[in-house]
């Protein structure tokens, strides 16, 4: 990971690499399975006390699997943005958005987006009460995909997402 700060702006890049090789026998036949996953991320964010803070990032993942006669390769491209803003010293607005494109070597399998937002109110720093309304899954995304691998299998999983909903929260500090 490499990180650099320029005044109130912080930039970072990071890479995660994982290589696994499994040598096994299945019904007296040798099977050599290799998995190589790579995740690269670039991020740019601000760090202000009173101005809105923004976090922009881009994540690119490659999941390369070779199970003897079968091989698969999955890609995930995911730009995202987060905003955190203090408004009139009493309201805090937070929102986050991410776009995900999950594909294999031939085509895109699924694209999905997530967008969440919240608005909270606290009269002042000494106030015991805080009120918040939160909206989750504003774009009403229905499912997301992930790929995983082990020593004997590669799987591509589709998970179903809870529909859009709103919550209201009251918080009291003792």
Segments predicted by a language model, with ranges:
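Exposed, low-structure sequence patches enriched in small/polar residues
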Residues: 1-174
């Amino acid at each position: 990971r490499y990180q650099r700060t320029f005044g109130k702006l912080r930039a970072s890049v990071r890479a995660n690499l994982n290589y696994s090789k499994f040598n096994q026998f299945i019904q007296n036949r040798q099977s050599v399975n290799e998995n190589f996953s790579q995740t690269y991320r670039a991020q740019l964010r601000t760090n202000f006390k009173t101005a809105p803070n923004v976090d922009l990032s881009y994540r690119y993942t490659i999941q390369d699997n070779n199970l003897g006669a079968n091989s698969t390769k999955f890609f995930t491209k995911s730009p995202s943005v987060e905003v955190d803003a203090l408004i009139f010293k009493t309201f805090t607005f937070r929102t986050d958005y991410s776009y995900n494109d999950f594909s294999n070597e031939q085509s895109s399998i699924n694209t999905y987006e997530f967008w969440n937002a919240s608005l909270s109110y606290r009269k002042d720093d000494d106030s015991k009460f805080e009120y918040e309304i939160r909206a989750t899954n504003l774009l009403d995304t229905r499912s997301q995909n992930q790929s995983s691998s082990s020593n004997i299998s590669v799987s591509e999983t589709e998970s179903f997402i809870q529909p859009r909903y709103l919550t209201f929260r009251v918080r009291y500090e003792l």
